[in-house]
A protein has these predicted regions:
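Short glycine/serine-rich loop segments
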Residues: 105-231, 413-426, 433-440
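Conserved hydrophobic/aromatic pocket- or pore-lining residues that grip, position, or stack substrates
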Residues: 81, 112, 291, 326, ...
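Acyltransferase
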Residues: 24-32, 61, 65, 276-301, ...
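A short helix-breaking turn/cap at a secondary-structure junction
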Residues: 193-282, 305, 461-484
Length: 484
């Protein structure tokens, strides 16, 4: 049988579709190639439950005789974070004692399958989606696909790793505090955190039900949008569902995206934080230089309303919402929880109803302050994460180091914003030199397509600059840097 190993070097959706149209590849051949890789060792601890060859083949067989052009995701392999339901496959949220086997898929998964996508497995995560490191799982600390000494980021850890390794063209994660963005940044991927409610969270094990979003990992903005378009739709029984309402003119297929004149809010210098990481500080400065070269307008903003909102998420009563999601299970089987998760959720009991209402009042005030900032800008640009860390560093100090990853992400869902993690080249100085660096573009609710257009312009208008996104030192799908 002909080898299709080259697939794993660039698993883009359009490249796959082109091969299907040309007859040089079939979905069944793709499944055979993927099964050969996912059935063996898993040194990155990316998977909780890879699908077997036969399980994947059922989805491939269902595509036989179908029109490729009628199915936007025809034969496209995707991975699913194991807190999202896939019919007939256990959902565990990385807690084996919590496992159940759904009879129907989550609506977002069902829509993707209906569009022709092929699920290939359930991925590892920080237990109950609580964490940004990927290290809080009984299935092993998820390791970075590009350098296994480093953390993958989380909580959608395996979702990012599966795409970075080229096994999946895209994957689904969830994002409450940055879980769909931090792992993307650590792997040079795009991570779309959509507007709350636009992708249904039915069939998703809740973390903070009022804040949870299903997120998308992809190799390109085009791929992320194709998945976003296919997955979107209101589930009638989803109380948190919202119709997608993009601003007028946001989705003009013939328009050429440009950064020229776009007003990017940038936190004041004294509000930027890298926790001593010179690699990330230098990389962000280089990203801002490239935005200026593309004629974007950089507007200094007071970032304090956003930082204060971020502090509410883990220093306020929203931790109690995590407990509410699994209280009955946690009370009955406390020893089934990962020790760090047990510590975090155990602290939720100290928050009273009065504390919660005081926090809601505080959040309303911060939203008002943030709205004033938005009057001057079109989007915010920040590092996606303030720093990165090795697996050993996280094992030594799991809560404090993890919290650093959320400095620029924790505010987004509380303020009802959309966000997109975008690759921004690699670190060129300091101890993280050679590892990917990412920025995040943040916009108002329902401006998801605006963000994707900004990302397209970012790629088109900044790739000629030294150290830019796809220069000779940048990690591409299926590659890794030898940093040893």
């Amino acid at each position: 049988m002909k080898s299709h190993d080259d697939l794993f070097q660039s698993m883009s959706i359009e490249a796959l579709r082109a091969r299907y149209r040309a007859g040089s590849l079939t979905p069944a051949q793709l499944v055979e190639a993927i099964a050969a890789r996912t059935s063996g060792d898993d040194p990155h601890h990316a998977w909780i439950r890879p699908l077997s060859r036969n399980e994947m083949m059922r989805y491939a067989d269902a595509l036989e005789g179908r029109d490729i052009d009628a199915l936007p995701l025809y034969g496209v392999p995707f991975a699913i974070k194991d807190n999202i339901d896939l019919a007939g496959i256990p959902t565990t949220a990385a807690c084996p004692a919590y496992a159940y086997t759904p009879t129907v898929s989550a609506p977002v998964v069902a829509r993707l399958i209906a569009a022709g996508a092929i699920p290939i497995g359930k991925t590892n995560l920080d237990q109950f989606a609580t964490g940004l490191s990927g290290q809080r799982s009984p299935h092993g600390a998820c390791r970075n696909a590009l350098d296994p000494r480093y953390a993958s980021g989380g909580s959608s850890s395996g979702s990012a790793v599966s795409v970075a390794l080229g096994l999946a063209a895209f994957s689904l994660g969830t994002d409450t505090a940055g879980s769909g963005r931090v792992p993307a940044a650590f792997h040079g991927l795009f991570g779309l955190k959509p507007t709350k409610g636009v992708l249904s969270t039915l069939g998703v094990v809740p973390a903070c039900k009022s804040l949870d979003c299903v997120s998308i990992f992809a190799h390109s903005a085009d791929d992320a949008q194709r998945v976003f378009d296919a997955a979107r739709g209101v589930a009638p029984s989803d109380p948190y569902a919202r119709e997608f309402q993009p601003p007028p003119g946001a989705a003009q297929p013939d328009a050429q995206p440009s950064l020229r004149g776009v007003r990017f809010g940038v936190p004041r210098a004294d509000q930027l934080e890298f926790f001593g990481d010179t690699s990330y500080a230098h990389a962000f400065d280089a990203a801002l230089t490239r935005l200026r070269a593309a004629r974007a307008e950089l507007v200094e903003i007071d970032f304090e309303p956003f930082l204060a909102t971020a502090r509410l998420l883990y220093e306020g009563p929203w931790v109690a919402e995590r407990l509410a999601a699994i209280r009955e299970f946690a009370d009955a089987q406390p020893d089934a929880l990962h020790p760090v998760i047990r510590e975090i959720i155990g602290g939720a009991a100290r928050w009273s109803a009065a504390d919660a209402f005081a926090a809601f009042d505080r959040l309303a005030f911060l939203r008002m302050q943030a709205a004033q900032v938005w009057q001057r800008i079109d989007a915010i640009v920040t590092p996606t994460s303030a720093t990165t860390a090795t697996v050993d560093e996280l094992e030594a100090d799991p809560i404090r180091v993890n919290s650093r990853f959320g400095y620029y992400t924790n505010f987004v869902n509380l303020l009802d914003l959309s966000a997109l993690a975008v690759p921004a080249g690699v670190c060129t100085v300091g101890r993280h030199a050679g590892l990917p660096f990412g920025v995040s573009f943040v916009a108002r609710a329902h401006e998801d397509i605006v963000l994707l257009d900004l990302a397209r312009a970012w790629l088109d208008e900044t790739t000629a600059a030294p150290g830019s996104i796809y220069d000779a030192t940048t990690v591409r799908p299926g590659e890794s840097h030898d940093r040893h």
